Amino acid sequence: MGHRWSRLLVFLLAAVILSAAGIGQVKEAGRFGRLQEDTVKTGAFRRQTLDDGMQDMIRDMEDPGELLGIYWLETGFGEQPFSGNCTEQAFESMGRSWKRRPYWNVYAEACRVIWDDLVYFPIPVSKDGDAEEISFVDSWMYERNYGGTRGHEGTDIMAGENVRGYYPVVSMTDGYVTHKGWLEQGGYRLGITAPGGAYFYYAHLDSYAEIEEGDPVKAGDLLGFMGDTGYSKKEGTMGMFPVHLHVGIYLIHDGEEISVNPYQPLKYLENRRIECVYGRKN
């Protein structure tokens, strides 16, 4: 009888261990399942969700893209709290398992392309000491209705004073001018392709600096001035909405243009504002 109970206990213990191992394997498989061939096309990736702790960690980093890529995979793209230590050494350790997975290189490159070329916030501060107030919120995929219902693929930086042609707009990155001119929705706009390949879109400008398509730009170069142009097929239309700058960021993945949420990149840059002499308010 004693031997029978002993064998039964051993069997039950083994079953518990195997069950726990199986659950662990299922969880691990689910975790690694976050990294797929089309991960960068998903809404979860495109939202670019970050908590305040991660923003604090990357604030002084020059090339945060790969680290953020690991963070998103570990947290289900910000859906789960991050349980690790916010140190570069901890992320290096966590990254080892991800770097062995299929599709890591393509995914990590997308993260670097979005983040590693960022240098300056697009609205400078005034050299004369005046507090030129601006504000922005996370309005990613908020409903917009001009030309049909759609999601808002960008972030609007709102002018503290509703004065067109007053707030300078500078390039967030190095790069070259890919597009310049009028768009029905975007008004006067510029598109800058950064060295890594991301496309930075600046819309509703009042006017342009002396800049043309094909010109090289450096981060901090003047692109133009904030305005309220757009929402019309007629070039030059103004006043359909308050003065603001619409910022968009786009990737090219498998030949497809993919928008990503600029809000967290702008938060990362909000203390990196160059000084500039503002003109008179008209």
What are these regions (language model features)?
Residues 1-14:
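N-terminal Sec-pathway targeting helices
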Residues 18-33:
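Membrane-interface motif at the C-terminal end of an N-terminal transmembrane signal
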Residues 28, 41-53, 67-188, 219, ...:
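Surface-exposed, glycine-biased beta-strand/turn segments
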Residues 155-157, 218-219, 223-226, 244-250:
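Active-site scaffold segments
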Residues 170-207, 234-243:
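Zn2+-dependent peptidoglycan hydrolase active-site motif and core
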Residues 189-190, 217-235:
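Short hydrophobic beta/alpha edge segments that flank linear recognition/processing sites
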Residues 238-282:
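Acidic, glycine-rich catalytic/binding loops that coordinate metals and/or anionic ligands
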